[in-house]
C-alpha cells in the first residue's frame, strides 16, 4: 500500500447540530455544518484526531444494514488510488468530489472486515 496519511474517521449522526455543540463544549475545533451530496457534514479537530460527521454516507444506498448512527469508515490518503483499489470489493466510486472545507479529491470506498469500509483518497486540489 502507498498510504500517505490518515485523513479522518467518519461517523454518522442523526442530530448534526447537537453533536457539533457537544464537541464545541468539549473544546474541539469544529467547522460549521455544510450541505454535501446527499446530506450534511461537519469536520471536528480533536488535537491529532480528525472526525468527519455525516448525516448520510455517500454510499448509504449501496450498503445494506448501515446503522442509523455510528462509525462509518476510516479515510486514508494515497498517492495511487488505482493501486489501492486493486483486489478490493468496491462499494462506491471512484469519483471526483469537491467541497469548500476539503478541496477536490478522487475517492473510492471499499469493504473491510468488521462491517466497516475504507475510503482511499487522492488529493487533487487543496481547499481555496
Residue ranges and their predicted role:
Residues 51-53, 120:
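Generic preference for hydrophobic
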Residues 2, 42-43, 86-128:
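Vicinal oxygen chelate
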Residues 60-61:
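A cross-kingdom feature marking solvent-exposed beta-strand/loop segments within repeated
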Residues 11-51:
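Core segments of cupin and vicinal oxygen chelate
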Residues 1-18, 71-74, 124-128:
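N-terminal beta-strand motif that seeds the catalytic metal site of vicinal oxygen chelate
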Residues 5, 38-40, 70, 104:
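Exposed loop/turn and edge beta-strand positions of beta-sandwich/beta-sheet ligand-binding modules
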Amino acid at each position: 500500500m502507498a498510504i500517505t496519511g490518515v485523513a479522518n474517521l467518519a461517523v454518522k449522526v442523526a442530530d448534526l447540530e447537537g453533536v457539533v455543540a457537544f464537541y464545541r463544549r468539549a473544546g474541539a475545533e469544529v467547522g460549521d455544518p455544510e450541505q454535501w451530496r446527499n446530506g450534511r457534514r461537519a469536520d471536528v479537530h480533536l488535537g491529532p484526531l480528525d472526525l468527519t460527521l455525516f448525516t448520510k454516507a455517500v454510499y448509504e444506498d449501496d450498503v445494506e444494514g448501515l446503522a442509523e448512527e455510528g462509525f462509518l469508515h476510516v479515510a486514508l490518503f494515497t498517492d495511487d488510488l488505482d493501486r489501492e483499489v486493486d483486489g478490493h470489493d468496491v462499494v462506491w466510486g471512484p469519483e471526483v468530489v469537491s467541497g469548500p472545507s476539503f478541496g477536490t479529491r478522487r475517492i473510492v470506498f471499499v469493504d473491510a472486515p468488521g462491517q466497516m469500509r475504507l475510503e482511499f483518497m487522492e488529493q487533487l486540489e487543496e481547499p481555496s
